[in-house]
Amino acid sequence: MPLVYHAPALKKRTVLFPRGLTRGRRAGMVKKNTWEVFVMLYPFNALLARMKYITRWSLMHSTRAESLSEHTCDTALLAHTLCLIARRYTGTPCRPKTVAVAALYHDAPEIITGDLPTPVKYHSATLRDAYKAMERESVASMTAMLPDELAEEVAPFLTGELLTAEETKLLKAADRLSALVKCLEEQRSGNHEFDAALAQQKAVLEAMHCPEADWFIAHCLPCYTQNLDELTRQDG
């Protein structure tokens, strides 16, 4: 649902409607003879910006808090890398740019539902199904914050329905790799709170049988334990 904005004056990008022609949408207005000035506001992106206030791993002691925005960015970068690995090395058909954008939206419904801890989310089939239903309602609520034309474009990214089975698997692997990296960082800082979570993420990734993730773990993951000097050193 668009928000209300009372336009102080007629300016560029201001939409004019005759009185009463609002088509059911709320809008701000300034009387000007027989016309009213309507400026439609859509809060979708402002709501997305709130991801930075949602803290992940909320039931665990962390040496450094991780926001949903950070996780989303990391997942998008990892998803893009996995897709490039797929195209160059493993031959898995995928669209790197499409998967990367889908990754940017993959946890957006948590702005409304909150980041429910994994042990709670998957405690039972009842809870899991209820949470999935909440996610669907969240997507519907969020897309309603856009014009219909834009909502049609964004909705498939929020739901992931535009992805193929192979692309969905790559995105899920990237999501798990982001969690794995977080666990490694916490463990490296001496925080044993994440030991079990680290083992769990490794087991899940292994069970996925994702060759792109396996390639990344073999060739890229060890670099996450290096310091800045080691990362930027140029041999030879």
Residue locations for each model-derived region?
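Intrinsically disordered, low-complexity segments enriched in serine/proline and basic residues
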Residues: 2, 16-18
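Short, linear, compositionally biased motifs with a strong N-terminal bias
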Residues: 19-20, 234
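N-terminal amphipathic/hydrophobic targeting modules at extreme N-termini
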Residues: 13-16, 23
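Polybasic, lysine-rich low-complexity intrinsically disordered segments
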Residues: 11-13, 32-33
